[in-house]
């Protein structure tokens, strides 16, 4: 943990605009990500950054809010709402002090310290804020993600432990969502083997920092826990956050091992894997087929997932998927014409993307 960490002025402004500071009540609701995106783009169009809002310049804020929204589906926030959110400075200070006492830090998308991997993979859908504790270098470390049902079968659990051990032997971080079942099985096995862990949480980041199983790893650089949601958000109030969390898991990893899955939108594992497989340049999604209780894994195979051969090593399985992906890219280039251009990141400016 970086003891000298300090909030940048840009991040202070984004916190004021987008965070609830653990409170449900307030005269003005914090901006949603789509609302923040249109506001940030308008601000950037005037040659300004979020930090410029801290002066509470009503003329500037009025000019920003008077801009036409860049999205036909999202209304530009009103001037009074922006001013009301920005005037919560004392509340922000109290909240940040509390988070810091738990070892929690915050970066915003307007911050140069924001994870490049998250920014590049999700672009305009990257969360405006990330709250984290532990080794921030693991944001860029890649690794293997592990997902699956909360009610995990014995076969799936053993498969996870075996693959985790293979990944740790190769020095690969283990990425998971921290939930009961597949996620915690992967994290616990990684800790037991001395591996590094990245946990993408939906809620209760403060509580997770105090868990005995996490404390040592957070302090010695062996773990990174992060969330795009208020660190004081409790399990009963996170709603669709669990579905959003899937995107962050896939963004942080180089591939994903699906140990067990149902079928359909009611299965978060299924929905996350299907969404990833629809991406034009998705990361490899591997499925474990040795679990009779997992009909979803068989169906994911039909949608482009790859079978994980339990008789082969982690390196061998990943080499096979890399060869297959290379063949697909060659076919795609021959079919569509090759283009080496990188996708444009919205609102890119020095210091970070607002």
Identify the role of each PLM range.
Residues 35, 40-42:
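An accessory alpha-helical subdomain
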Residues 53, 60-75:
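N-terminal accessory alpha/beta regions
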Residues 80:
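Extended, charge-enriched "interface" segments that sit outside catalytic cores
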